[in-house]
Amino acid sequence: MLAARGEIDAANAGTFTDYALAQCTRIRRLVVDLSAVEFFGIAGFSSLQVLSERCTDDSIAWQTVPSTAVRRLLRICDPTATVPVCDAVDDALCRLAGRRPSLELVTKPR
């Protein structure tokens, strides 16, 4: 799993991309947890595009868990949903493992 928090913009997107691509040399599945990202610039989206191409080329199954800021930019820049998105890390892990997420049972007061 690769997790980022704070901001991903032109100042650090290259570092993010380089780190993510370096992980791709030894994995078959990847979850990119961006749920704690507060600002996500167009350079961050470009990073996800590069990562998507690499994962496709290397047959790496991957999922992204976006924050509100990331989801907003994906809605604008990725209308065809080429970046795979899950609502939570647990959901992403289950999807990559080929399992359905567990049902969470909650007791209801009588």
Regions flagged by a language model, labelled:
Residues 1-38, 50-110:
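STAS-like cytosolic regulatory interaction modules
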